Amino acid sequence: MARGLAVFFLLAGACLALAEDVVDKGVAKARVESCSGUQLNRYPGAKQFIQEDLPLFHNTKFQHIGGAAPELLLLNKQDQELERFDLKKLSREEINELMIKKGFYKKSSKDEQVPEEYQEGPYMEKEEL
């Protein structure tokens, strides 16, 4: 009985390990989470990025979370979180550079068409800008 139980837990552990490996690790979209009021006002670089630059990036969105400090979440196609970045100490330029380094396309205007290679992820990280 004890041996059968040990085998069961061993197999269950192996299945869980395999399930974790199935997660798609390709960055396909990004979400910035933050409050849109007083908390965000403390971080002018993040506030400017969210208001002026985020709408120009393809496959990105803003999610209001009351009282939350600004964070960038990189997600796969299933909306699973792959990476999280604290934006509090970053300037607007640094956040833009981070997005571009992570492979996201920034349009020069809202009307600009997104090139074919940027339509869908996964996006590849760039070594140099």
Swiss-Prot record:
Localization per Swiss-Prot or TrEMBL: Endoplasmic reticulum
PROSITE patterns, A to Z: ER_TARGET
Chief site of localization: endoplasmic reticulum
Chain segments carrying region Disordered: 107-129
Pfam families: Sep15_SelM
Role according to the record: May function as a thiol-disulfide oxidoreductase that participates in disulfide bond formation. Involved in the regulation of reproduction during the period of rapid gonadal development.
Stated name of the protein: Selenoprotein M
Species this protein is from: Eriocheir sinensis (Chinese mitten crab)
Organism classification: Eukaryota, Metazoa, Ecdysozoa, Arthropoda, Crustacea
Gene of this entry: Selenom
